[in-house]
Amino acid sequence: MQLVLMAAVLALAEVGCFGCHLKNVSIPMERCGQRVCIHTTICEGLCFSEDAVFESPDEAPEHRVCNGDWSYEVKHIQGCPESITYPVATNCYCSACNTKDTYCTRLYAHIPSC
């Protein structure tokens, strides 16, 4: 029974508290002297990645990171000629880290548990 439970937990780990997923966030901004709150979605979470004990210069392990598909929306503020264009994540997924647009290195930090 414990083996079945552990297998189920591991299978669900990708969608658990650390899995790559959409998250609603609010970002305070100021335009034309008015303070507005932008409500959008971002991608957050961790993806499975191997971190070898021995680092070979010939073969680096593939680092997987939480990426997403994005679109942009525009918020118009009444009485203000300036609008706010902001990104909105529409889908999140784990993919190989691309060094052209992402800082791909080890994470030396304490990761709290759920």
Curated annotation (Swiss-Prot):
Protein name per UniProt: Gonadotropin subunit beta-1
InterPro entries named among the record's database cross-references: Cystine-knot_cytokine (IPR029034), Glyco_hormone_CN (IPR006208), Gonadotropin_bsu (IPR001545), Gonadotropin_bsu_CS (IPR018245)
Annotated glycan sites: 24
Origin species: Fundulus heteroclitus
Compartment(s): Secreted
Family the entry assigns: Belongs to the glycoprotein hormones subunit beta family.
Coiled-coil regions, chain positions: none
Keywords of the record: Disulfide bond, Glycoprotein, Hormone, Secreted, Signal
Membrane-traversing stretches: none
Cellular component GO terms held in the UniProt record: cytoplasm; extracellular space
Taxonomy, superkingdom: Eukaryota
